């Protein structure tokens, strides 16, 4: 076989980030009801986004019909492109015709392993995706809290990639991804998306989506001078406009951080 390069196509190793739809129950009726509850009012929210179905949270004796789950996701306009599974799940997970994918995070422990393990602070969860990291660990719920005002100071984190600075407005449909921290000097419009593996700083209104710590960094934070978002997410734990923000943070300068797997939204003192 000739090794000469073709001018028409090329095959090379690569990786693609995507959403993880983490299945935590084998009860399809409950799963379907929750999907409808969360997304029927905003069917365009994840319109045409691709996802990988993650079944690693299921118990050893649990199986789910992946074709049915693929259909559920299609109903809310998400497209399943593969399955993430534990090695012992590969035999049945591969039967749906979807490719088995490797996640770049720590593997989610099985329920049995979690029960046997000693109590300790929860490890960072499955990182989500290059376009939306944050799906399925937590959603828009009353558990998200608004905390008392905090001093505007970013946490000290390990050095990552260089900070990416965007000095132009982001319009609907635009997406920015930063391997480290991300600084945005212009407004993030509805339908625009900013994603970072580190912290996100937005010195203008945030009206689109902001997703920090997308590879499981629970110490990442979001800083914003005017909070009016479609979605905010840190390490996959997210909140949407389906759960309205309190008046003391809506449209205000805030920082957003994680505490005990909950999003804390804190007004900032900037003067």
From Swiss-Prot:
Domain of life: Bacteria
GO biological process: cell morphogenesis; division septum assembly; regulation of cell division; regulation of cell septum assembly
Extent of Low complexity compositional bias: 110-119
InterPro entries: CAP/MinC_C, MinC, MinC_C_sf, MinC_N, Septum_form_inhib_MinC_C
Keywords linked to the UniProt accession: Cell cycle, Cell division, Septation
Assembly with partners or alone: Interacts with MinD and FtsZ.
Classification via PANTHER family: SEPTUM SITE-DETERMINING PROTEIN MINC
Family: Belongs to the MinC family.
Name of the protein in its database record: Probable septum site-determining protein MinC
Natural source organism: Burkholderia thailandensis (strain ATCC 700388 / DSM 13276 / CCUG 48851 / CIP 106301 / E264)
């Amino acid at each position: 076989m000739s090794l000469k390069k073709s001018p028409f196509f090329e095959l090379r190793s690569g990786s693609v980030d995507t959403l993880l739809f983490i299945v935590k129950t084998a009860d399809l009726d409950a799963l379907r009801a929750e999907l409808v509850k969360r997304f029927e009012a905003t069917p365009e929210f994840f319109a045409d986004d691709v996802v990988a179905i993650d079944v690693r949270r299921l118990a050893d004796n649990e199986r789910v019909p992946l074709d049915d789950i693929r259909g559920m996701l299609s109903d809310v306009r998400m497209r399943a492109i593969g399955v993430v599974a534990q090695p012992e799940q590969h035999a049945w997970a591969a039967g749906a015709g979807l490719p088995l994918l490797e996640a770049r995070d720590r593997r989610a422990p099985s329920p049995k392993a979690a029960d046997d393990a000693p109590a300790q602070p929860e490890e960072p969860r499955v990182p989500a995706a290059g376009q939306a990291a944050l799906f399925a660990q937590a959603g828009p719920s009353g558990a998200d809290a608004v905390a008392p005002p905090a001093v505007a100071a970013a946490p000290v984190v390990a050095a990552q990639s260089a900070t990416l600075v965007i000095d132009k407005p982001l319009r609907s449909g635009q997406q920015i991804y930063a391997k480290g921290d991300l600084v945005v000097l212009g407004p993030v419009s509805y339908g625009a998306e900013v994603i970072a593996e580190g912290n996100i700083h937005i010195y203008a209104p945030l009206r689109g989506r902001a997703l920090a710590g997308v590879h499981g960094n629970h110490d990442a934070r979001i800083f914003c001078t005017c909070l009016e978002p479609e979605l905010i997410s840190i390490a996959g734990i997210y909140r949407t406009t389906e759960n309205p923000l309190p008046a003391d943070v809506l449209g205000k300068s805030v920082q957003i951080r994680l505490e005990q797997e909950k999003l804390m939204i804190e007004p900032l003192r900037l003067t």
